[in-house]
């Protein structure tokens, strides 16, 4: 894989930092759950991203104060956001697509291990198919090489 993935009009160097991620995704604190893009293979429709899990995450105040655990639904959301970066890069013209993507379906979600403060969550997403404005993905989240969660995720794009 090349260190410089390309889109129609943009050349990107890996890793892709948070500034570029914010240009591609509408999410902001406290709901931006992707910190860095480590790998991008547009031919294989695959992206690998990173989420640094910190004790400073607002959800740890209530989930659970005595035993902080990242909520599984936020792990799935982080996977979807990684897929969103890949989709925006594949569709973009001059670095931004006119579509805004929403998660519309999650199937076969599995949570194998808790994600806790200090973990580095690696988000591996592959687009399985695209039908008009719908994208179907498979994602795995890993910590230290071990799959902690996986799911099939469907997103729909609407004009922004």
UniProtKB/Swiss-Prot annotation:
Entry's Gene Ontology BP terms: fatty acid biosynthetic process; lipid A biosynthetic process
Catalytic residues of the enzyme: 63
Record-level Gene Ontology MF annotations: (3R)-hydroxyacyl-[acyl-carrier-protein] dehydratase activity
EC number of this enzyme: 4.2.1.59
Function: Involved in unsaturated fatty acids biosynthesis. Catalyzes the dehydration of short chain beta-hydroxyacyl-ACPs and long chain saturated and unsaturated beta-hydroxyacyl-ACPs.
Origin superkingdom: Bacteria
A GO cellular component entry from the record: cytoplasm
Family per record: Belongs to the thioester dehydratase family. FabZ subfamily.
Organism: Xylella fastidiosa (strain 9a5c)
CDD domains (UniProt xref): FabZ
Compartment annotation: Cytoplasm
Main location (coarse class): cytoplasm
Protein keywords: Cytoplasm, Lipid A biosynthesis, Lipid biosynthesis, Lipid metabolism, Lyase
Chain coiled-coil ranges: none
PANTHER family per record: 3-HYDROXYACYL-[ACYL-CARRIER-PROTEIN] DEHYDRATASE (PTHR30272:SF1)
Catalyzed reactions: a (3R)-hydroxyacyl-[ACP] = a (2E)-enoyl-[ACP] + H2O
Enzyme type, top EC level: lyase
UniProt KW Lipid biosynthesis keyword: yes
Protein name, as recorded: 3-hydroxyacyl-[acyl-carrier-protein] dehydratase FabZ
